[in-house]
Regions:
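C-terminal active-site subregion of NodB/CE4 polysaccharide deacetylases
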Residues: 42, 48-159, 228-255, 261-371
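Acidic (Asp/Glu)-rich catalytic clusters
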Residues: 173-182, 194-216, 272, 308-314
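A structural motif
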Residues: 203-224, 233-240, 245
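Bacterial N-terminal signal peptides that target proteins for export
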Residues: 4-16
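C-terminal motif of bacterial Sec signal peptides marking the signal peptidase cleavage site
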Residues: 24-27
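Bacterial signal peptide processing site
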Residues: 29-31
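N-terminal pro-sequences and low-complexity stem/linker regions of secreted or lumenal proteins
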Residues: 80, 119-122, 183-194
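Substrate-binding cleft of extracellular glycoside hydrolase catalytic domains
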Residues: 141-142, 154-183
Length: 371
């Protein structure tokens, strides 16, 4: 009797592994089936979402600039762009436009060289800017706007005075605007070794007063950087300002004003490695807005002195500037472009917000002030 019982137990024990294997296989089959079903449902859900997604509008275009000057965008994250664009708590409203001025030298009379402007024409330009509702901004404000769409005046102007000048020059041409309107002027400072102690001290005083916001414009006033420039020349022009700005101005420059308008792929990449965040050319292409920079991809036979910058693919390091002598005539154009851009944005607002709600809201959160 005990022998039969033992035999039965042995047979039962032999069947246990088989039962476990069968059970495991069945469980795996169920898991695979469930996983496959979930994947099919996910694909179906994704397809359903994709089919309901509204197509985003193309980049704003305008006929008010040269057709070869094509608006370039630089914000790759669509969700972040839409949130920055429509967050009315902290963001500049669509159509906020910045006119960037390049001033070589203001002459009492008889401006004849490129970049020069007479004192009379300069005063007329500044008064027209103010009467048209423009306000001057500092480089740090411009950087916050152009990178993240942080609020600035809807019509802003960035006034860049190229080259080194003493206090008497700035007092004569800029102090009244600082005193009466609070307008700061950006100075493209050339960090030449032979700058006199007195010139340094005068500019340091104006920097800490707030009237002048110094940024880097290389070392040698005659340098024109390009892709053919030697590594040592590129390094000298870009590193030189970093060596002296901290000691004298108590800051690192945010921007590099390309000396004499010369730039290239290699100089731009080197500037980025040295932590420059903005670059300004001498190319006159139009105003700039958040995620909207007009640049050329090809050489324009009618403007051979404007090297194309679009293919460098770094719009923030190749920003255009209006020449001082042409600024007055362009003010209405800049204002009109801002109005066109605002109207275009409002026409497409609901489409962008619907896209954001479907694609972005779960990860990026609700856009403040929009239910």
């Amino acid at each position: 009797m005990n022998k039969q019982t033992d035999t039965g137990k042995q047979i039962a024990l032999q069947f246990i592994p088989i039962v476990l294997i069968v059970f495991t296989l069945l469980s795996c089959q169920t898991f695979v089936t469930e996983t496959a079903t979930q994947a099919q449902n996910a694909v179906a859900g994704s397809s359903e979402i994709a089919s309901t997604l509204p197509p985003l509008p193309p980049t704003f275009q305008t006929t008010l600039i040269n057709p070869l000057d094509i608006p370039h965008t630089y914000v790759d994250d669509t969700c972040r762009y839409i949130k920055n664009k429509w967050n009315t708590e902290t963001s500049a409203p669509p159509g906020t436009v910045v006119m960037i001025l390049m001033i070589g030298q203001i002459q009492p009379v008889g401006a004849t060289e490129p970049g020069e402007i007479t004192e009379e024409d300069f005063i007329r330009t500044m008064q027209e800017l103010k009467s048209q509702g423009f306000e001057a901004i500092k480089m740090k404000e411009f950087l916050s706007f152009i990178e993240r769409n942080v609020k600035i005046p809807a019509r802003s102007v960035l006034i860049i005075q190229d080259g080194n000048y003493d206090q008497s020059y700035f007092n004569r041409y800029y102090r009244d605007y600082w005193k009466n309107w609070g307008w700061t002027v950006i100075n493209g400072w050339q960090s030449t070794p032979d700058v006199s102690k007195n010139l340094w001290l005068e500019n340091i005083d104006m920097e800490f007063e707030g009237m002048v916001d110094h940024q880097a414009q290389g070392v040698n006033p005659d340098t024109i950087l390009s892709d053919e420039s030697a590594k040592t020349v590129i390094a000298r022009e870009l590193q030189g300002p970093l060596d002296v700005f901290g000691i004298n101005y108590g800051k690192n420059p945010l921007a590099f004003i390309w000396p004499n308008g010369g730039f290239g792929q290699r100089p731009v990449e080197a500037a980025r490695l040295l932590k420059y965040q903005l670059g300004f050319t001498a190319n006159q292409r139009g105003p700039v807005m958040y995620n909207w920079i007009p640049l050329a991809n090809e050489i324009d036979p009618n403007r051979l002195n404007y090297p194309p910058e679009g293919k460098i693919d770094d719009p923030l390091m190749t920003l255009p500037r209006y020449h001082a002598s042409d600024a007055f005539a362009a003010i209405d154009q800049v204002r009109a472009i801002g109005k066109e851009a605002a109207a275009y944005a409002m026409d497409n607002r609901n489409i962008e917000l619907e896209y954001y709600d479907i694609v972005c809201s779960e990860d990026y959160g609700r856009i403040p002030t929009i239910p």
